[in-house]
UniProtKB/Swiss-Prot annotation:
Lineage start: Eukaryota, Metazoa, Chordata, Craniata, Vertebrata
Predominant location category: membrane
Positions of glycan attachment: N5, N22
CDD domains per UniProt: IgC1_TCR_beta
Entry keyword Lipid metabolism: no
Protein name, UniProt field: T-cell receptor beta chain C region
Membrane-traversing stretches: 146-168
Amino acid sequence: EDLANVSAPQVVVFDPSEAEINKTQKATLVCLAKDFYPDHVELSWWVNGKEVHNGVSTDPQPYKQDPKSDHSKYCLSSRLRVSAAFWHNPRNHFRCQVQFFGLTDDDEWTYNSSKPITQNISAHTRGRADCGISSASYQQGVLSATVLYEILLGKATLYAVLVSALVLMAMVKRKDS
């Protein structure tokens, strides 16, 4: 393998989509390791400082980013699926760790860039608090508040008419006496 092409991966974690969470009550985090060469990596998920295997689905092998090139860099993706409730806890910490098997101290490096050594590269995110207000629940709340306001306004108007009628009757009785 060509030492000049050796490069460590860039790692990023993507948060789950709200559409998936609302539809399935599950949350899928996606980890993408890209731009690495050679394809010697191991990917793992860590939740709250502990490695997890349940709910993890990783590509069977890294893929060439440019399949036509002999010296193409590689990419690898992995998914971690958790419950919506677990995702919506901001105390939960999710980390994708990629162990890149690069060069060792014994490998010669004469290029004008930093030596891509064996290293762990991570990306992380935290759970997001669910405020519990979706567009549909907000609209339902506004509709309920409007109906309640109209009922209270109607009730207040009815009481005002009733009190006015009683006052008018009392004034008429007083005149007659």
